[in-house]
Amino acid sequence: MKQYDLAEGMRMYIARLREQGRYSSAKSYQDALNSFLRFCGQEMILYTRIDREMLLRYQDYLRDRECSWNTVSTYMRRIRRVYGLAMENGEAPFSRYLFKGIFLGVKSKQKKALPAESLRLLMTAPLAAPELRKTQRALCLMFLFCGMAFVDFAHLKKSDIRNGVLRYNRQKTGTPMLVEIQPVARELWAALMTDTLRDSPYLFTFLSGTKTGEEAFREYTSALADFNRSLKELANACGVTEIVTSYSIRHSFATTLKEQGVPIEMISELLGHQSIKTTQIYLKSFSLDRMSAVNKACFESIYNEVSKVG
């Protein structure tokens, strides 16, 4: 009787993802496989060897190496997906409680939104270095473009701008987006476009427009790493002590709107989220001062009126 192997199953699944152009997902599965192989200490992992005790030990192994709970969840869900497919194909034994006690959820992380003053410094601090000014303009534009994700910003095309409106589809979900280009955005974008490659379809120079397939994915991940390094340098130059990444811009946009009383439904639509639950993860909790003031006002609106009647 043939013995089927999880590692081989994952490699086949990764190959299928690459064929579909889902390079980010393929990398996630490859990372999970590499980690599980290191834990097992061998290249072949028979499905018949995998049981709940083994997965619990693997979970402890990851935590001992200071992996976050979200990393644990990601790796375990990748294993569960491939094991489930093997089970459907009769290649792995049925096990109802295989993942019982294994963390498969999402731990809410510390929110990435920046304090308003830090955000203001990043946007407005005078800078001498041309590269830092370029990063500053990009940050301002991403904020002006409704907290646009870097992946969408980098992939904006010249043809996406028509009649003063930016029309594009989100890279992650395909959601169609419309953003009116404000006058200040035109100035910032014109300054960035001076560097745009003449023959490139892209609005900005993060991507060359000459790569396809997995090469294009690698070019994008390199551009993201470069941009995050530039943001770190910008923060240092502006005296901002918080960690600043491309995610900070998006989270800060959402939290600023929340603090201004904008309904979460509108914030969700502006961000292009398909679920309000996703938006809630982005939003930083209100400050204690703000919550105390609202609580006090709520009480007084009733108590003071009752006191007058009494």
Residues covered by each model-derived region:
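Basic, Lys/Arg- and aromatic-enriched nucleic-acid-binding interface segment
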Residues: G101-F150
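N-terminal core-binding DNA-recognition domain of tyrosine recombinases/integrases
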Residues: M12-S24, L33-Q110, A125
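Conserved tyrosine-mediated DNA breakage-rejoining catalytic core shared by Y-recombinases
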Residues: H155-A191
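C-terminal secondary-structure termini that scaffold catalytic or DNA-interacting sites
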Residues: R198, L207-E214, A297-G310
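Short, charged phosphate-coordinating catalytic segments
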Residues: G84-E91, M142-N163
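Short, basic (Lys/Arg/His-rich) helix/loop patches that form interaction surfaces
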Residues: P130, N228-E269
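Catalytic-site neighborhood detector that most strongly recognizes the C-terminal catalytic loop/helix
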Residues: A113, R170-G174, L271-K296
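Active-site/catalytic core of tyrosine-dependent DNA strand-transfer enzymes
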Residues: L119, Q182-T241
